[in-house]
Structures are given as C-alpha cells and as structure tokens.
C-alpha cells in the first residue's frame, strides 16, 4: 500500500503490475537517454561557436532522424501492446465477482454462489480501531483466493465511478448500463487498498476498496460462513 512521502510505485502484487513496473522502467530509460542527448546538444550550441553549414542539407542526417524516432516508438509500443493484451485476457477464471458502484459505496456479488453479496462502506474516522487506516478501511472486505485468476465485472448504479487497486495494477471504469471486466490475480496474501478514481460527487473521497487475499482453504471457510 502507499505510505507518506512515497516516491515510487506501490509494491507489485500481481503479474500485470509487475509487467507495468517493468514497462515504466523501460520507457523511463528511453526518455532519460533522449533527454540527456538533447540537453548535451543544447549545451554545445550555447557554449561553443562551432557550426556545420551543410547539416541541413545532409541526406544521411535526414535519414537518421527519420528512422531513429520510428525505431524508438516501436520499442515503446511493442511492450505496451503486450501488456494491453494481458490485461484484457481472462483464462478460465475460478471465480466471478460483480462490483457495482454507488454514491458513495461499493456493492459486491459473488455470482458463483447463490446468496453471497454485501455492501462495503467506509468506516468513519471516529469508529476506527488502533492501527486501522483513515479513509481506507471498510466494514466488509472483499475476500478472494490468492494465486488464482478471478474475473471482476464492474458497473455502476448511478454515475461514473472507477474501481482501482494500484498494487494489483487494476483500474476499471464503472459505467451505468455497461459491464467492464478485469482480471485479479494476487501473488501473495494480504490486504490491498484502493479507492474510487473517478470524481463522482461530494463524497467521492469516501469510497475505499479493500481486498483481502487469502489461501484457497481460508476462502472456502469464509464463503461457507457467509452463506
């Protein structure tokens, strides 16, 4: 989860988030090299009086600055397209959870079970227990099995919302009348926090998301106790 004065991304918890962080580093390296080259050339132009009168007419230079940007864009686009396909691909999910956004709470329905559904509201600051996080705790957590593919169906009952859990690399728009889907796969157990990431009204900041990833045996025990 995030912490005060954090400079980097949250620790990756899913394969998709790991790929996104690798892509971020890959792209940042390319941008850094280009920026360094541009700054070096600018500094040379400002500090020296050297000129090359035939530069603008050189066929070789024109060829280089046409082909090189195209190659750089391809180097950025190919990993990006690969990750986009990964995010859209859902292979044999073991569980489907339907998530509905409301003003201003989330409701969840485990569609593989007959009567397993609940609403999830933020816990007010006055009701927090020692060690709990302000504006991030909920009264009903979403309990899911770890290391298994889970399909999340996301929609909304009223206005636009966005269901986002950064450490899992998830951000899916909740649009009234439309179902969007995302894949949830956690590499380890734990609590993972998120929030609504689409301005949806006066209490937009009070729509936290808490996923509790547990081993499959614990999930089966929890689901049996909820039915």
Curated annotation (Swiss-Prot):
Keywords: Copper, Electron transport, Magnesium, Membrane, Metal-binding, Mitochondrion, Mitochondrion inner membrane, Respiratory chain, Translocase, Transmembrane, Transmembrane helix, Transport. Component of the cytochrome c oxidase (complex IV, CIV), a multisubunit enzyme composed of 14 subunits. The complex is composed of a catalytic core of 3 subunits MT-CO1, MT-CO2 and MT-CO3, encoded in the mitochondrial DNA, and 11 supernumerary subunits COX4I, COX5A, COX5B, COX6A, COX6B, COX6C, COX7A, COX7B, COX7C, COX8 and NDUFA4, which are encoded in the nuclear genome. It is an enzyme of class 7 (translocase). Residues 1-14, 88-227 are mitochondrial intermembrane. Belongs to the cytochrome c oxidase subunit 2 family. The chain crosses the membrane at residues 15-45, 60-87. This is Cytochrome c oxidase subunit 2. It comes from the Eukaryota. Its main location: mitochondrion. It catalyses: 4 Fe(II)-[cytochrome c] + O2 + 8 H(+)(in) = 4 Fe(III)-[cytochrome c] + 2 H2O + 4 H(+)(out). Cu cation A1 binds at residues 161, 196, 200, 207. GO terms for cellular component: mitochondrial inner membrane; respiratory chain complex IV. Residues 46-59 are mitochondrial matrix. It comes from Praomys jacksoni. CDD domains: CcO_II_C (cd13912). GO terms for molecular function: copper ion binding; cytochrome-c oxidase activity. One of its GO terms (biological process) is ATP synthesis coupled electron transport. It is found in: Mitochondrion inner membrane. Its EC number is 7.1.1.9. Mg(2+) binds at residue 198. It is a multi-pass membrane protein. Component of the cytochrome c oxidase, the last enzyme in the mitochondrial electron transport chain which drives oxidative phosphorylation. The respiratory chain contains 3 multisubunit complexes succinate dehydrogenase (complex II, CII), ubiquinol-cytochrome c oxidoreductase (cytochrome b-c1 complex, complex III, CIII) and cytochrome c oxidase (complex IV, CIV), that cooperate to transfer electrons derived from NADH and succinate to molecular oxygen, creating an electrochemical gradient over the inner membrane that drives transmembrane transport and the ATP synthase. Cu cation A2 binds at residues 196, 198, 200, 204. It holds the Pfam family COX2_TM.
């Amino acid at each position: 989860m995030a912490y005060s004065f954090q400079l980097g991304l949250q620790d990756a918890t899913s394969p998709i988030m790991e790929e996104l962080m690798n892509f971020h580093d890959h792209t940042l390296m390319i941008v850094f090299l280009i920026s360094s080259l541009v700054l070096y050339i600018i500094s040379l132009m400002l500090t020296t009086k050297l000129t090359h009168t035939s530069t603008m007419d050189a066929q070789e230079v024109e060829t280089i600055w046409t082909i090189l940007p195209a190659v750089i864009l391809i180097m950025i686009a190919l990993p990006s397209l690969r990750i986009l396909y990964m995010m859209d691909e859902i292979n044999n999910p073991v569980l489907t959870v339907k998530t509905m956004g409301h003003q201003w709470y989330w409701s969840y329905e485990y569609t593989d079970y007959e009567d397993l559904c609940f609403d999830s509201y933020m816990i007010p600051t006055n009701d927090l227990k020692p060690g709990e996080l302000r504006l991030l705790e909920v009264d009903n957590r979403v309990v899911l099995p770890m290391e298994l593919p889970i399909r999340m169906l996301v929609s909304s009952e009223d206005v636009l919302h966005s269901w986002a859990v950064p450490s899992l690399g998830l951000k899916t728009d909740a649009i009234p009348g439309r179902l969007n889907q995302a894949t949830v796969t956690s590499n380890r157990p734990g609590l993972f926090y998120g929030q609504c990431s689409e301005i949806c009204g006066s209490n937009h900041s009070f729509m936290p998301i808490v996923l509790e990833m547990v081993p499959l045996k614990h999930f089966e025990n929890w689901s049996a106790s909820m039915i």
